A protein has these predicted regions:
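Catalytic metal-binding/acid-base residues of hydrolase active sites
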Residues: 4, 67-68, 93, 161
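The substrate-binding groove and active-site-proximal loops of carbohydrate-active enzymes
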Residues: 34-42, 122-134, 183-195
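Aromatic- and acidic-residue-enriched segments that line the glycan-binding/catalytic groove
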Residues: 73-89, 166-180
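Active-site neighborhood of glycoside hydrolase catalytic domains
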Residues: 195-206
C-alpha cells in the first residue's frame, strides 16, 4: 500500500515533492523519488519487481507506454532497471505532453523535448497523423512478433498514457461522438476511451492469430 512504500503522490523531478503548499497540515517527508530496485537515492522505496522475478525465471519481458516508477535521473525511472528487457516509450513522467504526432508527441522539429512530459521513443511516428495510443499498440505488436521467435514465455506490460490530460481528439473516433450530440470535450474524452478499447482488441486479436489466446493470462486493471 501507499503507506508502506510512502510514495503517496505523483513523482517527476528528482528530490522535488509535488505536494501543494498547506497552511493547515504538516506535509510528510514522503518518497518523492519513487521506487527503485537499488539503494543509493534518498526518499526512495527499494524493492524487487515481480517483473525481475519473471525475467529470472525465463520470461521475455516487455514494457510499453507509461512507466512512472521513479523520478528523473534516478535508477527507478528506466523500466529496464525493473527487469524489463524491452522498453517502449516509458520514462519518469506519468503524463504526456500530447497524443498528437503532428506535435511529435512533445518534441520540437529538431527532436528536442519541449516538455518533461514528452513521450520518448516514438520518433518513427512523428508527423504521421498516428495517435499516441495507436503508435504504442503497433509497437507492442512488433515486440510480440519478436517475442514469438524466442521460444520462451513472454510478459507484456501495456500501460497506455490514455486516459490522461491533455484530452486530445483521437480523430478516428471523435466525429462519431460529435454526431451523437456530445460536446467537443466529451467527444474527445470518449475518443480516448475507444482508442484504448481498440488497442485491447488488437492485442487480443494478436493472441488469437498466433495461437496464444488459450495459453495467456490477460489482466486488465
Amino acid at each position: 500500500t501507499d503507506t508502506r512504500h510512502r510514495v503517496t503522490n505523483w513523482t517527476l523531478e528528482k528530490n522535488k515533492a509535488t505536494d501543494r503548499p498547506s497552511n493547515t497540515i504538516q506535509l510528510p517527508d514522503w518518497n518523492y523519488n519513487g521506487v527503485s530496485q537499488v539503494t543509493g537515492t534518498s526518499n526512495t522505496f527499494v524493492g524487487t519487481s515481480f517483473v525481475e522475478l519473471l525475467r529470472q525465471n525465463g520470461y521475455h519481458t516487455i514494457h510499453c507506454g507509461k512507466a512512472h516508477f521513479g523520478s528523473i535521473d534516478t535508477p527507478g525511472e528506466n523500466p529496464t532497471h525493473w527487469g524489463f528487457e524491452v522498453n517502449i516509450a516509458g520514462h519518469a513522467a506519468g503524463g504526456l505532453a500530447t497524443y498528437l504526432s503532428e506535435q511529435n508527441y512533445g518534441h520540437t522539429r529538431d527532436g528536442k523535448p519541449y516538455s518533461l512530459m514528452a513521450i520518448p521513443g516514438l520518433e518513427d511516428y512523428w508527423g504521421t497523423g498516428i495517435f499516441a495510443t495507436e503508435a504504442l499498440t503497433r509497437e507492442a505488436i512488433k515486440a510480440l512478433d519478436k517475442a514469438k521467435k524466442y521460444n520462451q514465455p513472454f510478459y507484456l506490460y501495456m500501460a497506455h498514457y490514455a486516459i490522461h490530460v491533455p484530452v486530445d481528439k483521437d480523430m478516428r473516433f471523435f466525429p462519431k461522438y460529435i454526431k451523437k450530440g456530445l460536446s467537443d470535450k466529451e467527444a474527445a474524452y470518449a475518443s480516448l476511451i475507444e482508442g484504448m478499447d481498440k488497442s485491447l482488441g488488437d492485442l487480443m486479436n494478436w493472441l488469437e492469430k498466433n495461437d496464444e489466446a488459450d495459453n495467456t493470462a490477460v489482466s486488465y486493471t
